[in-house]
């Protein structure tokens, strides 16, 4: 691992990844890979998660293509130096911020959306001019092998490499020094990544998860609400980091919500859900058994059918869920939807705030003041009102968590910023030295007054006239001296 990282760092130090033209070429090559090898990509993801080609394309491929196009369109503007506002002391100088690549980036991908959650941060890292080591999740084995095969055929083989393996390989990778680590996964591993990064003072972006609440107000159209929740919850068999994890609603709404979700599930997946090409499977047997354990002691309103041989768990809704039970203590990451009755919106807000900050918050109501109130009085990585998941689709938004749901953000310009150092640059002249006398010893009260005037905009009114006359005299002297030389 050490040799691989050293090789990538040497490639970065060559400066090859920095020019705008090179970055654009690599992004175009990545787009070409997605377009030319679409069938290989679809097949690999389908094999890992039993996804239909339509779901793979709509949930992963199209997002990657959109992100690349967005970068290609905007990158020439983003890489340019940006002038900044100057103060009196620097008014004759050149002051700007220059985005600069961080260096060698490690991207540790996720298994639930193994293509988009690995390639999307890669797009940002390339756009920012970095070298990258990509570590796909070993749980999505077919996608990991596909990335290791295809990426070297299209991208610079020295600057961008794929390393496959399990816990042992990842642990060894984390011992190496990187300039940024980008991790997508669960909170427990996120802490391990952050601890390893701290040994080298390496900054991290942690895209984690959590229990994303969904509050349903009594003042809304339940038919529409339940269709949108059903789509977001059971997409990818519930294995989505921003899927609605549980519902908060008044007890009087519970039976209606159950019935409407049940009818929507039939509409989406048919009478025999197990045979639907649009309904995926749990990634492996370990996660299958973990999810089943969450059903113990729960009141199943509908669903609950399972098949261990195919890792099938039917869309399931639980009612009257006790907040102290296991299903409410950890992120579900599966097709189980608990309903927790609350008395009103006040209790819902308190319920959310008493727990770890979620990756997403969903609020359904015709009353936009209520939605705004929940936004103002809670904290989460992102919010969507009257829908679910959709804030992920807007690449002008930063996507990321807060607290235990993560740190840092990406997508669009936010990806470029995450993988860039905003370097402040001040260029002064070696002339006009007379204007610098105020900052050189010996010090005096008049110099303190000048400092207040220039830097703090605080001054003694009685001395204002004298200060202004002195300032004008210095400026005149500087100009005369500059003209003389």
From Swiss-Prot:
Name the UniProt key words of this record, in alphabetical order: Endoplasmic reticulum, Fatty acid metabolism, Lipid metabolism, Membrane, Microsome, NAD, Oxidoreductase, Phosphoprotein, Transmembrane, Transmembrane helix
Transmembrane stretches, start-end: 464-484
Q: How does it sit in the membrane?
A: Single-pass membrane protein
Q: Does the keyword Heme apply?
A: no
Subcellular location field: Microsome membrane; Endoplasmic reticulum membrane
Show the Pfam families listed in the entry.
Aldedh
Q: Which reaction does it catalyse?
A: an aldehyde + NAD(+) + H2O = a carboxylate + NADH + 2 H(+); a fatty aldehyde + NAD(+) + H2O = a fatty acid + NADH + 2 H(+); (2E)-hexadecenal + NAD(+) + H2O = (E)-hexadec-2-enoate + NADH + 2 H(+); hexadecanoate + NADH + 2 H(+) = hexadecanal + NAD(+) + H2O
The organism's place on the tree of life at top rank: Eukaryota
Annotated positions of the Phosphoserine modification: 293
Xref: Gene3D superfamilies:
Aldehyde Dehydrogenase, Chain A, domain 1 (3.40.605.10), Aldehyde Dehydrogenase, Chain A, domain 2 (3.40.309.10)
Q: Which residues bind NAD(+)?
A: 185-190
Q: Which residues lie on this side of the membrane: Cytoplasmic?
A: 1-463
Instruction: Recall the GO molecular function terms of this protein's record.
Output: 3-chloroallyl aldehyde dehydrogenase activity; long-chain fatty aldehyde dehydrogenase (NAD+) activity; medium-chain fatty aldehyde dehydrogenase (NAD+) activity
Q: Which family does it belong to?
A: Belongs to the aldehyde dehydrogenase family.
> Its function?
Catalyzes the oxidation of medium and long-chain aliphatic aldehydes to fatty acids. Active on a variety of saturated and unsaturated aliphatic aldehydes between 6 and 24 carbons in length. Responsible for conversion of the sphingosine 1-phosphate (S1P) degradation product hexadecenal to hexadecenoic acid.
Q: Which PANTHER family match?
A: ALDEHYDE DEHYDROGENASE, ALDEHYDE DEHYDROGENASE FAMILY 3 MEMBER A2
Q: What is this protein called?
A: Aldehyde dehydrogenase family 3 member A2
**Taxonomy-wise, where does this protein's organism fall, top ranks first?**
Eukaryota, Metazoa, Chordata, Craniata, Vertebrata
Gene that this sequence comes from: ALDH3A2
């Amino acid at each position: 691992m050490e040799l691989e990282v050293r090789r990538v760092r040497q490639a970065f130090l060559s400066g090859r990844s920095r020019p705008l033209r090179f970055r654009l070429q690599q992004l175009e090559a990545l787009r070409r890979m997605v377009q030319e090898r679409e069938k290989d990509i679809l097949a690999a993801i389908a094999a890992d998660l039993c996804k239909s080609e339509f779901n793979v394309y709509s949930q992963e491929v199209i997002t990657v293509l959109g992100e690349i196009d967005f970068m290609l369109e905007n990158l020439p503007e983003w890489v340019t130096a940006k002038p900044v506002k100057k103060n009196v002391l620097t008014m004759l100088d050149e002051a700007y911020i220059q985005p600069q690549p961080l260096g060698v980036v490690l991207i540790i991908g996720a298994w639930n959306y193994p293509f988009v959650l690995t390639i999307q941060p890669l797009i940002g890292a390339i756009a920012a001019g970095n070298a990258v080591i990509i570590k796909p999740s070993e749980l999505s084995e077919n996608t990991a092998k596909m990335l290791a095969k295809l990426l070297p055929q299209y991208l610079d083989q020295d600057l961008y490499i794929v390393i496959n393996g399990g816990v042992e390989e990842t642990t060894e990778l984390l011992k190496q020094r990187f300039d940024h680590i980008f991790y997508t996964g669960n909170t427990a591993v996120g802490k391990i990544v952050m601890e390893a990064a701290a040994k080298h003072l390496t900054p991290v972006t942690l895209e984690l998860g959590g229990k994303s609440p969904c509050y349903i107000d009594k003042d809304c159209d339940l038919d529409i609400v339940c269709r949108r929740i059903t789509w977001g919850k059971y997409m990818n068999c519930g294995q989505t980091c921003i899927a609605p994890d549980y519902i908060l609603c008044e007890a009087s709404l519970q039976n209606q919500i159950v019935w409407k979700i049940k009818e929507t599930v039939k509409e989406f997946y048919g009478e025999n859900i197990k045979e639907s090409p649009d309904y995926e499977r749990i990634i492996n047997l370990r996660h299958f058994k973990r999810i089943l354990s969450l059903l113990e002691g729960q009141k199943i309103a509908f669903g609950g059918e399972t098949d261990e041989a195919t890792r099938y768990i039917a869309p399931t809704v639980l009612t009257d869920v006790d907040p102290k039970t296991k299903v409410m203590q950890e992120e579900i990451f599966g097709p189980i939807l608990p309903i927790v009755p609350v008395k009103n919106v006040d209790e819902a807000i308190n319920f959310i705030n008493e727990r770890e900050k979620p990756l997403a918050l969903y609020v359904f109501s015709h009353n936009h003041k209520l939605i705004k109130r929940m936004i103002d009085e809670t904290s989460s990585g992102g919010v969507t009102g009257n829908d679910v998941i959709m804030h992920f689709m807007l690449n002008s938004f930063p996507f990321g968590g807060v607290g235990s749901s993560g740190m840092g953000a990406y997508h669009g310009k936010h990806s470029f910023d995450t993988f860039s150092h905003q370097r402040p640059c001040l260029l002064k002249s070696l002339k006009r030295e007379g204007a610098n006398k105020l900052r050189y010893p010996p010090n005096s009260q008049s110099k303190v007054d000048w400092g207040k005037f220039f830097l703090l905009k605080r001054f003694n009114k009685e001395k204002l006239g004298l200060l202004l006359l002195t300032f004008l005299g210095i400026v005149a002297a500087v100009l005369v001296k500059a003209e003389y030389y």
